[in-house]
């Protein structure tokens, strides 16, 4: 089983890239990164979030075929699925390999 590695963003990133705390976690939303560049793994996407990612998007976990990285605490309301679900869901991004395949 793959372990979850916590690499949490700072409080300033939480303030600037989320709706803050209070997520009741009633849903799970899964997306793919759509990033097929070499090296675009879970660790790279976690680093993107720690830097305050310029996409105005945030999510809780990034998954690749080697690891799972948690970037935001579960009770934070991340920006990943529109206003209807941001406030009540855990966001997961699945990395895409350079051949376009998803392996988890």
Set out the residue ranges of the language-model regions:
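Long, well-ordered alpha-helical scaffolding segments within enzyme catalytic domains
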Residues: 55, 88-104
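N-terminal catalytic cores of peptidoglycan-degrading enzymes
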Residues: 1-83
């Amino acid at each position: 089983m793959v372990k979850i590695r916590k690499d949490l963003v700072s409080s300033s990133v939480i303030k600037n890239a989320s709706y803050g705390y209070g997520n009741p976690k009633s849903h799970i939303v899964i997306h793919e990164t759509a990033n097929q560049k070499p090296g675009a793994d879970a660790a790279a996407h976690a680093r993107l979030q720690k830097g305050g990612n310029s996409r105005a998007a945030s999510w809780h976990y990034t998954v690749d075929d080697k690891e799972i990285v948690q970037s935001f605490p579960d009770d934070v309301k991340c920006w990943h699925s529109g206003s209807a679900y941001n406030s009540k869901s855990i966001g997961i991004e699945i990395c895409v390999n350079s051949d376009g395949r998803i392996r988890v």
